[in-house]
Amino acid sequence: MNSKRSCVYVVLFLFVAAILVISAGMAVNQLKEQFVDIQNEAQTMNDNNIVDKLRKRNKDVIGYLEIPDTTISYPVMQKKDNPDFYLNHDIDKNYSFYGTPYLSAYCDLEKSDNLIIYGHNINGGKMFGALTQYRDETFYKKHKDILFTTKDKKKYKIFSVISVNKNDFPYWKFVMAQDEPDYDTFINKVRQYSIYDIDITPKYGEKILTLSTCDNRRGDDYRCVVFAVELVG
């Protein structure tokens, strides 16, 4: 009797597991379909036009983020009166487990020294899942540039990749440098945590772009973070 009961439990477990796997696959496909039209438009339209068009769809759109030849090609949101709203909402403000990349509510596009963008780490490289590939230096060498369009398209060059406990290094608190020593201290700290060395050191006054996602393989408090400096001229 116990043997039969165990068999029933095993069958039920496998059935539930199969349902969960299928559901997860359907959800990822739904996520892909949700952004595919936007990504196709971004490839064919002028960069400023795609941002303007998306703003008409939702005034919370503040820019468009791309890392060429990766899966990262998404609108970026910001809602200062509800900072984490897009952690679990799509561009149309509908609930979404996967959310939409969003700029920290503490950041000002024009004034901040460091623009911090958050996104979920989704299996298959969706949303900011591709950021974890930067733990491999070979991947970095093939994808050194980040494009972020707001009023104009700006190019950023990656200078550090870290995987860190957010409580050990609260990088997310640095938005505006108090002075040059404060800026340099932050940059040195970032480079100290770098997984591998990159021969680029931002100078005071240069704008930083920070992309942050969960590093699921290390634990709930760990983040995989990519830092880049704006190229001017």
Protein language model regions, located:
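Solvent-exposed, non-transmembrane regions of membrane-associated and secreted proteins
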Residues: 20-233
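N-terminal Sec-pathway targeting helices
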Residues: 1-16
